[in-house]
Amino acid sequence: MSMLRLQKRLASSVLRCGKKKVWLDPNETNEIANANSRQAIRKLVKDGLIIKKPVTVHSRARCRKNTLARRKGRHMGIGKRKGTANARMPEKLCWMRRMRILRRLLRRYRESKKIDRHMYHSLYLRAKGNVFKNKRILMEHIHKLKADRARKKLLSDQAEARRSKTREARKRREERLQAKKEEIIKNLSKEEEGKK
């Protein structure tokens, strides 16, 4: 059997693949050996004496199965971990995600007029200061603030109503006293005139 190194090289160039992927018909070695040009190789490819082998299967089925298992938390124990906790899930990334969630919520609340810009600013700074661990806690805090504000407003309104009521009562009482005084003075002046 003659060496078909040249033919293999030319075939790989013609077929645009590696030399490993070229199949030369072992029964037709003499005919293949005579082909020493690209044109001749193309003819042999057309005749089916030289074939480009198919791509070998590299299945991802096992990989997919393992990935699904890992999502459930399998194969992720202490013994499987190589990097530090910070390398596996950076603290900065967690912080960025949390800040983006909290700031998005605050922005949405401000746009929908659920909170005013002053409350927005104070809560924004508090979020930056690591006061709120997650979105739920921030929402609860906002509801609590709003409830407190509403309660204070109600109490102040009630106090104002009470003050205005007492003011009115005092005014009426003063008017009554004034009227009584005037009446007494009138009576006294009449009596004095009667005596004269």
From Swiss-Prot:
Subcellular location: Cytoplasm
Keywords annotated in UniProt: Cytoplasm, Ribonucleoprotein, Ribosomal protein
GO biological process, one term: translation
Region named Disordered: 153-196
One of the record's GO molecular function terms: structural constituent of ribosome
Biased composition (Basic and acidic residues): 159-196
Chief location of this protein within or outside the cell: cytoplasm
Highest taxon listed in the record's lineage: Eukaryota
GO CC annotation: cytosolic large ribosomal subunit
SMART domains found in the cross-reference section: Ribosomal_L19e
InterPro entries: 60S_ribosomal_eL19_sf, Ribosomal_eL19, Ribosomal_eL19_CS, Ribosomal_eL19_dom, Ribosomal_eL19_dom1, Ribosomal_eL19_euk
Role: Component of the large ribosomal subunit. The ribosome is a large ribonucleoprotein complex responsible for the synthesis of proteins in the cell.
Annotated family: Belongs to the eukaryotic ribosomal protein eL19 family.
The protein's assembly and partners: Component of the large ribosomal subunit.
Name this polypeptide is given: Large ribosomal subunit protein eL19
Origin species: Ictalurus punctatus (Channel catfish)
